[in-house]
Amino acid sequence: MPPRKTARPRRRDRKHIESGIAHIKSTFNNTLVTITDKNGNAISWASAGTVGFKGSRKSTPFAAQMAAEAAAKQAMEHGLREVECYVKGPGAGREAAIRSLQAAGLEVSVIKDVTPIPHNGCRPPKRRRV
């Protein structure tokens, strides 16, 4: 009887990507940072909630900074060096997230605002009276 080959678990090869796109979605309640390759395949992502902020603290610029830092560190393990920033939404963490990506060691080549603006589409929610 021939010796049986033991099934060895396959090691997943890390994708080595030089440049990518950082999608920053900043809402009034949270900030999401997704870093993708040029084709749009996600390499890493983080949000203010996944970094450990809860409730109203998620909407702060500091939370956005921490989320961007976490996503950048994860992406730099794949060899990422340069990103284009696509910023969407009206939130407080827009600039903080971009600055944090630069501080983490990523070179930001382009900053583009891709906030969707309606040509008078849906009716917006009513104004708050506090």
Curated annotation (Swiss-Prot):
Pfam families: Ribosomal_S11
Family per record: Belongs to the universal ribosomal protein uS11 family.
Signal peptide interval: none
Record's GO cellular component terms: ribonucleoprotein complex; ribosome
Protein name (Swiss-Prot/TrEMBL): Small ribosomal subunit protein uS11
Organism: Moorella thermoacetica (strain ATCC 39073 / JCM 9320)
GO biological process annotation, one example: translation
Function: Located on the platform of the 30S subunit, it bridges several disparate RNA helices of the 16S rRNA. Forms part of the Shine-Dalgarno cleft in the 70S ribosome.
InterPro entries for the chain: Ribosomal_uS11, Ribosomal_uS11_bac-type, Ribosomal_uS11_CS, Ribosomal_uS11_sf
Keywords assigned: Ribonucleoprotein, Ribosomal protein, RNA-binding, rRNA-binding
Subunit comment: Part of the 30S ribosomal subunit. Interacts with proteins S7 and S18. Binds to IF-3.
MF-aspect GO terms: rRNA binding; structural constituent of ribosome
PROSITE patterns xref list: RIBOSOMAL_S11
